[in-house]
Amino acid sequence: MLKVDKLSKEFKMHIRDGLVIEGFSDVTFTAYDGKLLAITGASGIGKSTLLKCIYRTYKPTEGSVVYSKMDGTDVNLVKADDQTILKLRKTEIGYISQFLSVIPRVSALDILTNRLSAKSSPETELRNMAEYYLNKVGISKTLWNMYPSTFSGGEKQRLNILLALAAKPKLLLLDEPTASLDIKSKEIIFELILDAKKSGTTMVGVFHDKDAIKALADGRFDMFENKLVAV
């Protein structure tokens, strides 16, 4: 479970004489295990900034983000030290951005096998699992040993989503995960996300895709004038 309480983010522009730009303010919501909470709203309103504050890419200005860990204890992600945040990102908290970011000159199969290594299974088993997942999302076998930089936009995004879901995070943050996918690819990703929900993963996602909201969301908030409103 994730409890966000009175969360705010401001950006202070030191090169602009201390100009303060509001990202969002006074955001409060609870996301439950096995549920997906959708965040909607106009572009540039602060939705992605909110996700980045939860993930701690940005440090919130005010408020708290209390996350219930796998071991049953709670941690305030706003106040947690960097070491704790990095450990949680590696083992429990996933983030799907709009762009694939991976180690260059490493094959898709090796990248996914490495991501699965947290399962502490034998190398052969991990590789078989990686092949299974790549096949499941419709990435051609001829691409498995290729660098993701050579993939099409849709193939990159399918791999991007797969890397996050295959690690089976307890909390998953999604920033427009289906933005560049065709209908068939969307259906595959919908299935993976629904499977993750069934396994208990808590999800908070930014969406513009109405089909995705209808298929996946258990609740929805709309961001308007930098504030979050239940829909």
For each predicted feature, which ranges?
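The feature captures the beta-strand-to-loop junction immediately N-terminal to the Walker
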Residues: 40-42
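Helix-to-loop junction immediately C-terminal to a conserved catalytic motif
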Residues: 55
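ABC ATPase NBD Q-loop/coupling interface
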Residues: 64-87
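Q-loop/switch helix immediately C-terminal to the Walker
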Residues: 99, 106-117
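Conserved ABC ATPase "signature" region
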Residues: 124-142
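Conserved ABC ATPase signature
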Residues: 147-151, 155
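ABC ATPase C-loop
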Residues: 164-165
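Catalytic Walker B motif of ABC-type/P-loop ATPase nucleotide-binding domains
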Residues: 172-175
